């Protein structure tokens, strides 16, 4: 069994669902995952509106709206994909694997949508996210990523976010 710890499938799912397609994982990705013997995924919630991303077409949406949309698309895909099971722990992943299904951890890649509303971290947790990166490549209210000023690092708000995420 192979675990793909950083999968951008949710990005593709969301892009296609917003264009009117459904059953994206089943129709476009399941056979590739089987062929590659992928038994587990780390699905990234990435909603940064880069100019070359499909999110640029939704420039009127803030980061949290994009996050909610991606989660709605993910939930719809789960309903269409009984072979894919979201998990929160390694024990759950082993159970799903033993049942012959594919497990998926949810990860947040860049927390720009949190802004200064740290209660949104709890919403990520309710959705099942157990992995969170404060930045993608950008600089946001929590921290400076690879594309930000290296002198800025983790902000005070970012420190509080880390404390909350460790609970």
Locate predicted features.
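N-terminal hydrophobic targeting/anchoring segments and the immediately downstream early-domain regions
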Residues: 1-156, 160
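Substrate-binding cleft of carbohydrate-active enzyme catalytic domains
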Residues: 161-167
């Amino acid at each position: 069994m192979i675990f793909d710890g950083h999968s951008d499938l949710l990005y593709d799912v969301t892009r296609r669902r917003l264009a009117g397609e459904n059953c994206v994982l089943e129709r476009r990705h399941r056979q590739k995952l089987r062929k590659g013997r992928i038994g587990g995924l780390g699905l990234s919630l990435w909603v940064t509106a880069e100019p070359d991303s499909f999110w640029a077409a939704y420039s009127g949406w803030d980061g949290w709206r994009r996050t909610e949309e991606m989660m709605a698309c993910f939930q719809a895909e789960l309903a269409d994909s009984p072979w894919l099971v979201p998990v929160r722990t390694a024990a759950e992943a082993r159970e799903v694997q033993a049942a012959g299904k594919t497990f998926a951890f949810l990860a947040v890649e860049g927390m720009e949508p949190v802004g200064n509303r740290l209660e949104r971290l709890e919403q990520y947790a309710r959705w099942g996210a157990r992995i969170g990166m404060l930045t993608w490549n950008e600089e946001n209210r929590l921290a400076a990523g690879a594309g930000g000023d290296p002198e800025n690092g983790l902000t005070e708000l970012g420190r509080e976010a880390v404390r909350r995420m460790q609970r």
